[in-house]
Amino acid sequence: MSKRTLLTYFSSSGSSTPLETNDNTRQPKMPRVEFRCSDIISDPGLRKPIDDYLSEIRDQVKRAYVLRGPTQQALGFTYPRKWQSGEWRSFQHHWFEKYDWLEYSEAKDAAFFFYCYLFFHPGKPEKFSSNVFANIGYEQWKKALEKFDKHAASQSHCNSRLNCDDFMNQRTSVA
């Protein structure tokens, strides 16, 4: 009886057939998702919702917007006037002083809330027009301050602001 060594247990014998590999069962490589800061759209009325970005780059997108800050026109910009409730009305530049997170879209002639754009979750029940201030835009200037104040006091807005503060304060690396 011949002694077998450890290697003989693992060496291939010519009688076995090689395992077949099927190229169709291999998973295709997913293209690498990249985000460039140049992809940032400054006008809030033209932006796509944050949740429409791939989850792999969503934080990068949020960080780029946070670094850029809210879109606020320079003093002297002429806001278009609309006939509303029997008067000519328009967005007022001094509202930026009271609401530092307020944004204005030239494309839609509408107001947006920066924190709500970044951290609004559309799956949650909508109260106080959260989606309007995050993605659609508010354009009823007669009651704008009343609506801004009501929304700013809402849990949705407060949570968005806290989430933004937490997001800005998180460490980018553990070292």
Question: Predicted segment positions?
Answer:
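N-terminal leader/early-domain signal
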Residues: M1-A175
